[in-house]
Amino acid sequence: IIICIFLLTLCPLVTLQADDLTQTVSIVPCPVQMVSGTGHFRFSGGTTLVVENAEQAKVVRNFINLFTKAAGFTPVLKTGKMKGDVRFVTDKSLKSEAYRLDIIPEQITVRASDVKGFFYALQTIRQLLPPDIENHHTVNALWTVPCLSIQDEPRFGYRGLMLDVSRFFLPKEYVLRIIDCMAMLKVNKLHFHLVDDNGWRLEIKKYPRLTEVGAWRVDHTDVPFHSRRNPLPGEPTPIGGFYTQEDIREIVAYANARGIMVVPEIDMPAHFAAAQAAYPWLACRELEREVPGYFGGRVPTLHGIRDWNRSACLGKESTFQFIFDVIDEVCELFDAPYFHIGGDEAPKDEWKKCPHCQAKMKEMHLNDVEELQGWFNNRVLEYVKQKGKRLIGWNEILAAGNLDPSVIGQYWTPKRDKNVERHIARGGDVILSNHRSFYFDMTYGQYPLSYTYDFDPGRYHISPRSYDHVLGVEAEVWTEWIDKRPKLDLNVYPRMQALAEVAWSAEERKKYADFKERLEAFKPTLDALGIGYAVTSVAEPGTFQRQKPRRLFYCGDTHYELKLNEERKAKGEK
């Protein structure tokens, strides 16, 4: 027995045999501790799930709906202290989000201290069921789970995925599908990048031109992102879309029901070109312009100018009134305690020449344009704080010496940033999103799957003694190089599974070879969900095989890996 327990604790991928039934125990992310039992528990229409209260019932109802769709029967849900086949028991000795799961042939017992823990226990049971549980049509199967005991809790409280819908707009239904997969993998924060140079994606009732103008651009999808030309005046703008405020309420409610917090990002003061196309007075130079199809500040105007005039003018009070009005409406829609302002890659040359910005610097006794942005960030922070929110920004904002230390810095840059270290030393908090491990827009030739799985905070000079100031990790799905949903699926899966394990599983439990085996067992679940993914040879190419996709990407062929993946899947590769 001791040997069995030892093997299961170290090797989460285990095949159990009982009553002529063979099932593989394969859970992503890997639990903290798992011990095998004997036999299996079977779900049926007569299975009774007993909860203690309405809050638990709400979580369990979504789990029961899986059986209604895929199995053709609906287990019974009851509230109270009666006997049941699946019992939910509050145990205040467990941490928030932690759970204990005990499965024997006659009963399943789920223990947690809060509804989050109960939810994550159900996601583990969901993965223990046959993959057909994810189908939306009735399947004839044995709906069983193996007997075992699990004790589990997350490594980080903040386990995030950022979705850039500015560069490549995603319909609401696709966002909901991503939320479903995040929930199954215990990823609990959706960072919604709603605004950038290339599109404003959120309805703001006080400023209708943000979506009438700012949400649409010229169709350049047949041209590599970095080769796109300036739009011409009056050229049709069919590419884009936006979310109505009702759409956002639906997305937030759907996510909340699945244990996911939606964190809005309104990028400011840079990456503001779409807003300036709608309202030119937001810029230092009030030129008419179109929504660009490119990034990096090559902002086209009606005068044929390509310049860096994409930062909001920080010297005009009208800019702040606009921003505060937008914040008011955004905070009514999102209940997260965070508000992300981006703040990265802010071109500052305009501020050096702008009479409004220079007058403001003189008035506020600011030494340079870095301090001007720091002053801007602090002013927005104070407004956001009044709304009960905490400000998040990319780590470039930490360069300002006058920044309020309550800001959360999101550390994305590939190299060591001493401003991050200084921020932590002052008691500031950070989220780790380092480029090498967590930029899912990159090809696998550039950053193979192992780069995500092998993430190590120490590589970025985050020492263990600073971990109290690390809220968690987040991966970024930028979409400059993504213009098809199959391409997005390819880039995200199986990287999201690796992200989940980095964010949830204890460091000593992680073993890449074991993860790859469990990943293979997870792929039928993705198939059942209709989600595309990179096959093994694409996600983890050899050193020589990495060269071609990387070279072609830099030459503008962003679809090479997608085509290669489709060819290999057609040949039966997983």
Specify the residue positions occupied by each region the protein language model found.
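Flexible, acidic glycine-rich loops studded with aromatic residues
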Residues: 391-407, 413-574
